Amino acid sequence: DGHARVSNYQSRFPRVDVEEILELDNVDYSTGHIDFPGTVVVRNAVLDGFQVRARGDIIIEKTVSNVFLKAEGDIILSGGSVTRNSGYIEAAGSIFARFAQSSSLLAGHGIYIQEVSMHSRLTAGQEIIVEEGRGEIIGGDVLAGQRLKARKLGTKMETGTRVTVGVDPDTFQKLREMDAQYEDQKKTYHRVLLHIQQIEESRKRGKASQEDEETEKRLRMVQQKLEKHLENLELQRERLIASINPVEGAEVEVREQVYPGVEISFGVGVRKYRVERRSLPG
């Protein structure tokens, strides 16, 4: 169904645009992957392994896991994200989520998390804000173009948490392309592992054919190549981040505590915290 809205277009008469909205109960085998020229609203869940692409926004009521989401607008996750490092979420605008755990989130503007980010890769062109509720960033790799705000960074367990701020637009675009390539290769890698696992299960049941054995050999070679490629992409990303010259006005604001194990980088300068801090020195 289309939703009407009045455009701010400057003319003698207001122009009415129709914004396409697709509303679904779930995204699963009954719907298949979704690629829609407007906004997609999912009232319940997106089943693991499925993709949702939208030229508008994506709004999902329940927690997402191993899914691929890409929107040219914003992404709103009412239930949060637990992608277990095998899903990928990208918005040209902003991402809003209740929490993120072992997730990869990339936003052109901002990432806004209500409760906590745990062991996640967060990348935003402008800002990352985790201030409501617990307001904690625990573990993971967090990169923001201009600013980061949180209540707490790290934990008393000295969980390694890396924060980088002050990324110029050109470098951010390179990181975005690199991350997209990494996630694409990782999806292929997981498919290869799944196929190998299926052959191993067939062998245990005594049903593996000679063709299966030959296929496994080829898959093992592909697995090794993909592992090296993924490792190389990670190294390239590390080098790119290490070469960043921070933009003017980049800032990190922590309202309560910075724990040991946290690294904060403004470009090439890295500050490591070995003792607990109740305020973040400038």
Model-predicted regions and their roles:
Residues G145:
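Extracellular/lumenal glycan-associated surfaces
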Residues I111-Q114, E127-I137, K149-R151:
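Hydrophobic alpha-helical bundle architecture
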